[in-house]
Regions:
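Cytosolic Rossmann-like ligand/nucleotide-binding regulatory domains
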Residues: 14-82, 87
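Long, charged amphipathic helices and adjacent flexible linkers at domain junctions
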Residues: 1-15, 86-87
Length: 87
């Protein structure tokens, strides 16, 4: 996870890896309810840059660049968090 402050601290650019048990893994862009204030800029997968569309699916190990308003960082952290599985 890397992040960079932009716009005099009003926003951040965050690069994060999609883990196998992340809430985003194997999800289609159109099925993700991104909060207002968070946008996906690009995905780095298998040595290629992908500009996501509504049909893009997040894969394990994708490196994703997010743009977020500072006030939305907590919501983004929740999206990137690990899903708990109970048996």
């Amino acid at each position: 996870l890397s992040d960079y402050s932009i716009g005099e601290g009003f926003g951040e650019v965050i690069e994060a890896e999609i883990l196998s048990n992340s809430a985003l893994c194997n999800k289609n862009m159109k099925d993700i309810d991104l909060p207002k204030g968070i946008r996906i800029g690009s995905i780095f997968r298998n040595g290629k840059i992908i500009i996501p569309t509504s049909s893009t699916v997040f894969n394990e190990n994708d490196d994703v660049v997010f743009f977020s308003e500072s006030k939305c960082i907590k919501k983004l952290e929740e999206l990137l968090s690990i899903k708990q599985s109970y048996e």
